[in-house]
Amino acid sequence: MMKKDRILIISPHPDDETLGMGGTIAKLINSGTEIFILTVSGHLPPLYKQEDYEITIEEARNAYKVLGVSNFDFLEIPATMISDLPVHEINSKISKVVVDFLPDQVFIPFPDRHIDHRVIFDSAMVATRPVKESSKINLVACYETLSETH
């Protein structure tokens, strides 16, 4: 029996992965691929109300259910404030998921004009370097999310 691929999708915000590659996610799930979605930030205080975050997380969970994704996590960093954290902290959080999940492939956001997308792109590139813990990764690819910042 062939080993199933394990794919990690890193999303700066809830919905970026679905807007950027929802069809691909559904196709991969239907083919038996194991998918893990890591969402780094969300609509959290101080810029948003806590209720806004709860709504977007529930929407993300519903989208994952439709797509067939059962493995996911939310890091709960406030949106547009990712760049306020020390780079090593973000790198470490993403690296931990890479080491724990041990993906074969990783999909990351294209580094467009949105600062959160650029920071997550950079941190994901650090986390997926070919070192011992992540050496089984055979592909790192970008997905694009059209947004108001394009």
Language-model-detected regions and their locations in the chain:
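Short beta-to-alpha linker loops that shape the active-site pocket of alpha/beta-hydrolase fold enzymes
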Residues: 41-43, 78, 146
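ATP-dependent adenylation/pyrophosphate-handling site
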Residues: 5-51
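Short, structured active-site "lid" loops
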Residues: 57
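Short beta-strand segments at enzyme active-site cores
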Residues: 38, 73-74
